[in-house]
Amino acid sequence: MELSYFHVAKDVPSGIKPETSVVIDVLRATTTIACALNNGAEAVQTFADLDNLKEQASCWPLSKRLLLGERGGKKIDGFDLGNSPLAVTSNVVKGKRLFMSTTNGTRSLERVKESKSLYTMSFINRKAVAEKLISNQSKSVLILGSGWEGAYSLEDSLAAGALASFLLNKNPNSVHILNDELSAAVALWSCWENNIEGCLRNATHGKRLERLGNHDDDFTCCSELDKICVVPTQREKGVLCSL
């Protein structure tokens, strides 16, 4: 298995259509997606463009849809929910389609939507995603972070390193790292694997969330490792389900 990692969507070379992609947005989109599907959401449909989201959502009955998203870490005016994984409880999301747009994560999903297989990952479902890649015998995997407004993020690289380290430990002779970005992410993981939440709080996006208010419970949730077994999978372009 060949692994490569790119910090943000714009770093992915043009013309690439990956066989398999894994999108990461630890704080907080891919954590929220995993939690929503784990709690029974019918699907999470992602959008980079808000007007497109509203148009598509209008085709669904009010009782079967939720608008979910943030800009700058704050809930979008008029939306049902923001981007907290704690808000997507079973009694709120079960059986519903979530229409989601975030500052960073949905851009990365848009960039690799042509992938043959597309998954989303955070710390909370790292093992499940890694085992899915192994069981699928994926030959080439592009791991894509989301960053913050087009710039590098510490927490996404930490998660990329966590995924690569798991795969390397499982199959050291058949997993190959193709770029320095991922080698650096693996090294970062070796430094912080015993204090994930500490790394998230030290990251600039973590500090940004702290300035917006008390997000202690979000930090705790986003730093939990291998807690749930859901693998958010693109069923059709832009639509993620638990398959």
Swiss-Prot record:
GO terms for molecular function: 2-phosphosulfolactate phosphatase activity; magnesium ion binding; sulfopyruvate decarboxylase activity. Belongs to the ComB family. Its cofactor is Mg(2+). It comes from Prochlorococcus marinus (strain SARG / CCMP1375 / SS120). It catalyses: (2R)-O-phospho-3-sulfolactate + H2O = (2R)-3-sulfolactate + phosphate. Its EC number is 3.1.3.71. This is Probable 2-phosphosulfolactate phosphatase. InterPro entries: ComB-like, ComB-like_sf. Keywords: Hydrolase, Magnesium. Gene3D superfamilies: ComB-like.
